[in-house]
Amino acid sequence: MPEYKFKNIMNHYPTIRISSSQMETEVLRILLKLGFQEKKARTCASVFTNNSLEGVLSHGVNRFPRFVNYILNDLIDVDAEPELGYSAGAIEQWDGKSGPGILNALKCTERAMELSKISGIGCVALANTNHWMRGGTYGWQAAKAGFVFIGWTNTIGNMPAWGALDNKLGNNPLVIAVPFGNEAIVLDMAMSQYSYGQMEKKTI
């Protein structure tokens, strides 16, 4: 981007710095106003804030207005609780009941870890949910608890297959995480050069 354009943008949209605690408090306030139970609201506010704080702006607070819009348009049920639909040993299928994707994904990651303690592996599928925001959140959740994690989601068809013209494939996020000492090594990537959220970030 040419320097003069950058300066012009900054003149119109000055940078405002706020603390992470202030950011999280404001997100929490809005979620409570939208009818979230306090525990659920605090969890979501923490995830949105940490995503931004850790540099993943494309899936942090930048996505929060859309999350609010989904709630206002009844696409997210703030009171929904995920429900087990099918179980076979180390495999489970859960119905997210159109609840917040963050909460549903955290729950299913926890279930996968519980299953792996029993069977050595846990495979959990989740349907009828909403955007889980940053996939790496759940990789960190599992790896820091001592588990290897592989996770992905489906999405709309917005990419053509190699050599084709029509959009048929989703730009699905893929997450692979392994424990590393007290931390973790986490791969969190899109299937293309950019995630949709990264492209959106450029327009802000």
Predicted regions and their residues:
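N-terminal glycine-rich anion-binding loops that anchor highly charged ligand groups
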Residues: 16-23, 36-62, 76-87
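Phosphate/diphosphate-binding glycine-rich loops and adjacent basic-rich segments that engage nucleotide
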Residues: 159-204
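Active-site cofactor/substrate anionic-group-binding motifs, chiefly glycine-
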Residues: 60-113
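Alpha/propeptide regions of enzymes that mature by internal proteolysis
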Residues: 46-49, 101-127, 134
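Generic N-terminal amphipathic, Lys/Arg-enriched alpha-helix
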Residues: 2-34
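General beta-strand structural signal in soluble alpha/beta enzymes
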Residues: 122-128, 149-153, 178, 186-189
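Long, hydrophobic, well-ordered secondary-structure blocks that form the structural core
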Residues: 129-161, 166-168
